[in-house]
Amino acid sequence: MDFPTRFDVIVIGGGHAGTEAALAAARMGVKTLLLTHNVETLGQMSCNPAIGGIGKSHLVKEIDALGGAMAEATDKGGIQFRILNSRKGPAVRATRAQADRVLYKAAIRHTLENQPNLWIFQQACDDLIVEQDQVRGVVTQMGLRFHADNVVLTTGTFLGGLIHIGLENYSGGRAGDPPSIALARRLRELPLRVGRLKTGTPPRIDGRSVDFSVMTEQPGDTPIPVMSFLGSKEQHPEQVSCWITHTNARTHEIIAANLDRSPMYSGVIEGIGPRYCPSIEDKIHRFADKESHQVFLEPEGLTTHELYPNGISTSLPFDVQLQIVRSIRGMENAHIVRPGYAIEYDFFDPRDLRYSLETKVIGGLFFAGQINGTTGYEEAGAQGLLAGANAALRSQGKDSWCPRRDEAYIGVLVDDLITLGTQEPYRMFTSRAEYRLILREDNADLRLTEKGRELGLVDDRRWAAFEAKREGIEREEQRLKSTWVRPNTPQGDAIAERFGTPLTHEYNLLNLLSRPEIDYAGLVEITGDAVDNPQVAEQVEIRTKYAGYIDRQQEEIARLRASEDTRLPVDIDYLGISGLSKEIQNKLNQARPETLGQASRIPGVTPAAISLLLIHLKKRASGRQLEQSA
């Protein structure tokens, strides 16, 4: 049977990628369907109960700047907030929040159910309707057909999902949920490169069976940070601490003695796991010289005793898991509520995608999240928003959009994936970005909100707050620039005494703020007229202190942008370009890069090859001009 309503965009999956994709498309005014196998699991945090961290919070803030839901849901569900790298420069500072799973999921569901243009339907998707290399809709488990020319797949770990505990395994999308077998089989029929990846999760612990008195308490920061640009600490629920303990020699002995019972080390698991979130057995094997590893006990929520022991993800048999847990200080009598496990799943080579996250072989079919080889809620949410927005743009007959590497971490993420591909679950770090001084988490709105408004992603409430902030920054910078302090005056003497900086002549306050020893709060305490908005004060201080470095980075970006953005024709014949080696011809022909900049980042493509490409493009353009004049 055909569903009576035709949609512009259909999103498959209600995880972090799917919810952001559906919300983005609906915000842009197109008729959107979110199809999920279970409405009760919309926005569920399948692994650790945390949002943000190094590189990841930058993505969350960018999602927020573009009108997404993740940051605001974190503020409503966050039970501990911390700023990581707070003593380092602003480029690498990151916000991290522990979240109450129930509160976070409720916030996401509330947002979904109150979003205009968005329909939600509970059914598993088993098939795609494809006609002449163009997607036309989907078919559910009960044979119901939904029609749309744009479909976003956000299947997480469900495609061919296989759960491992010891040498036993069974089909599943995650613990308690069925896998997507029929859809996985259908996707494998398409001309797309497919592989297997693996991720894992630790056993959950009953907090009543833990001795916290022998552990190190890790409270949140004061004052409490916020995640969203629209957030406030008044939104936060009760705040709680995490606790730190360590593995020990006994723990490592138990693991080493049972590696033959590990599905990873016995060859049962074929998929590659995340390098930067390894299982405890992987840590013991790879870092055999380390005597201990940290374990962070993270509360799962305010209304449960469950704890998430971050650092001991494992797929060893349950009896070994119990020995491991009880060998750790403070957990000698611990009760395991849920066993840890590993899960293998299908992913598709992201090099088969365009910058819009649309597949190159099937028009209107978009992929986002773990299906593209990434790991993490934040990476998934960022891709989901972009894919949903581009699906909406396509339905409106408009050009696709993706931020450049110098505009957003989302741009870095997508460019890395579609240019380089990935052999292991991809995680975002600040070190992946060349222009991280410009791509700070604190200025994500200044970089992206205006574009989001243009696309239709940003509502009036966010736009008004953004304009007020932007105007506040400009006004305060102008005030500091036009306010002067002279030596041998009460203000001049107070500045000299507080900062140890005698004034030799007249300075404006902006000049003084550029000095490393002078901070904004201390300066305006002496001179008066501080701004009320802490986001404005933060921006003024960072922009002033790092102005020289930022200007140099902007100049470098401007130099590179001309060649970076040069489009490569869809029909270009790389095999016919003389001067290119066969190896480079084949690499370019396989990757089919969209721009010269993307071509330059393909492994093995040399600067000389890029120069030859540029010459070829100029010859091609001049040849067409001659044809037109003739």
Curated annotation (Swiss-Prot):
One Gene Ontology term of the molecular function aspect: flavin adenine dinucleotide binding
Protein name: tRNA uridine 5-carboxymethylaminomethyl modification enzyme MnmG
The protein's role, per its UniProt record: NAD-binding protein involved in the addition of a carboxymethylaminomethyl (cmnm) group at the wobble position (U34) of certain tRNAs, forming tRNA-cmnm(5)s(2)U34.
SMART domains in UniProt: GIDA_assoc_3
Name of the coding gene: mnmG
Chain positions recorded as NAD(+) binding sites: 273-287
Cofactor: FAD
Organism of provenance: Pseudomonas aeruginosa (strain LESB58)
InterPro entries according to UniProt: FAD/NAD-bd_sf, GIDA_C_N, MnmG, MnmG-rel, MnmG-rel_CS, MnmG_C, MnmG_C_subdom, MnmG_C_subdom_sf
GO biological process, one term: tRNA wobble uridine modification
Taxonomic lineage of the native organism: Bacteria, Pseudomonadati, Pseudomonadota, Gammaproteobacteria, Pseudomonadales
